[in-house]
């Protein structure tokens, strides 16, 4: 049976990287977290990713080695075709996805896709963005405005205002509920 592709989305500062890092500490035999290929230095940001030059990225894309790819915030992002092998082997695969590119993921994976939108309250989102110190005040305000107006339709919502442990527990419960439903189809 084919696994589910869990497309985790959320605004910058919602805690996606922290959630994925915490999830990796849990023993999950049927859930794999996919790494992303990004045209960003390996030491930039907190995400565990594979850094590529733009040339390397375009070469991989041109050879159909990326299952999904997109451009956002001046960078190119991609997920390798290895996720298709994992899915066909029956593993669930979690991807740090893009809200704007959910339609692309939906078109490719259709009923195997489980879209989850990570949300936090505006106050907590502002605090997290200020604490990480990457954006100035106007950039933070722009990110808050985008977060408020851009929530994808037809996706499961996961609130990340609480503890990471609580959010990971809720995420795993949601994934396992969908696995049971998927197995009955």
Swiss-Prot record:
SUPFAM superfamilies: P-loop containing nucleoside triphosphate hydrolases. Pathway: Metabolic intermediate biosynthesis; 5-phospho-alpha-D-ribose 1-diphosphate biosynthesis; 5-phospho-alpha-D-ribose 1-diphosphate from D-ribose 5-phosphate (route II): step 3/3. This is Ribose 1,5-bisphosphate phosphokinase PhnN. It comes from Escherichia coli O157:H7. Keywords: ATP-binding, Nucleotide-binding, Transferase. Catalyzes the phosphorylation of ribose 1,5-bisphosphate to 5-phospho-D-ribosyl alpha-1-diphosphate (PRPP). GO terms for biological process: 5-phosphoribose 1-diphosphate biosynthetic process; organic phosphonate metabolic process. NCBIfam families: phosphon_PhnN, PRK10078.1. GO terms for molecular function: ATP binding; ribose 1,5-bisphosphate phosphokinase activity. It is an enzyme of class 2 (transferase). Pfam families: AAA_18 (PF13238). The gene is phnN. ATP binds at residues 10-17. Its EC number is 2.7.4.23. Belongs to the ribose 1,5-bisphosphokinase family. It catalyses: alpha-D-ribose 1,5-bisphosphate + ATP = 5-phospho-alpha-D-ribose 1-diphosphate + ADP.
């Amino acid at each position: 049976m084919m696994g589910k592709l869990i497309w985790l989305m959320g605004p910058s500062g919602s805690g996606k990287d922290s959630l994925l890092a915490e999830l990796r500490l849990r023993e999950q035999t049927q859930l794999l977290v996919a790494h992303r290929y990004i045209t960003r230095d390996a030491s930039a940001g907190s995400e565990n990713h594979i850094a590529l030059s733009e040339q390397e990225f375009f070469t991989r894309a041109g050879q159909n080695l990326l299952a999904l790819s997109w451009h956002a915030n001046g960078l190119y992002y991609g997920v390798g075709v290895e996720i298709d092998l994992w899915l066909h082997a029956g593993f669930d695969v979690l991807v740090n996805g893009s809200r704007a590119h959910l339609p692309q993921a939906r078109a490719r994976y259709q009923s195997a896709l489980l879209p989850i939108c990570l949300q936090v309250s505006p106050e907590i989102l502002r605090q997290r963005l200020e604490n990480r110190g990457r954006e100035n005040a106007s950039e933070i305000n722009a990110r808050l405005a985008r977060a408020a107006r851009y929530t994808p339709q037809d996706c499961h919502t996961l609130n990340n205002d609480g503890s990471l442990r609580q959010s990971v527990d809720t995420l795993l419960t949601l994934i396992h509920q969908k696995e049971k439903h998927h197995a009955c189809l």
